[in-house]
Amino acid sequence: MCLLGCDIGSSSIKVSIVDEETGLTIGADFYPKEEAPIKALRPGWAEQNPEDWWSYVKIGMKGAMRKAKVKGEDIKAIGISYQMHGLVVVDKNPITTSAFSPKNVWLVFLHPTNLSQIVIA
């Protein structure tokens, strides 16, 4: 059996697959191959689309599994680390779940007087 680790960062998604018995990494991949885009719509703001993260996770997992020569049923557990201070709000439907809006990433620098600009739905 194998363990899969996924690091969801603001520049890329990194995925590693480890053989449970030996502790050795048997496959790894990352995506996108160039730094993920970050939109700065105004000074001090930085946004990414959570839908892009999900696409990158799927691509990275497929790449790592291909390199490790394993199938989904060979994965015993998945561990996920995520960029700090992140919250992605989704709807309640598990089939069509999608993020409500682009996500401010950790490198947003909001002065307390600017916090009123954030709308909580």
Label every model-predicted segment.
Residues 105-121:
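Glycine-rich phosphate-binding loop plus the immediately following alpha-helix
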Residues 1-99, 111:
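N-terminal glycine/serine-rich phosphate-binding loop of ATP-dependent small-molecule kinases
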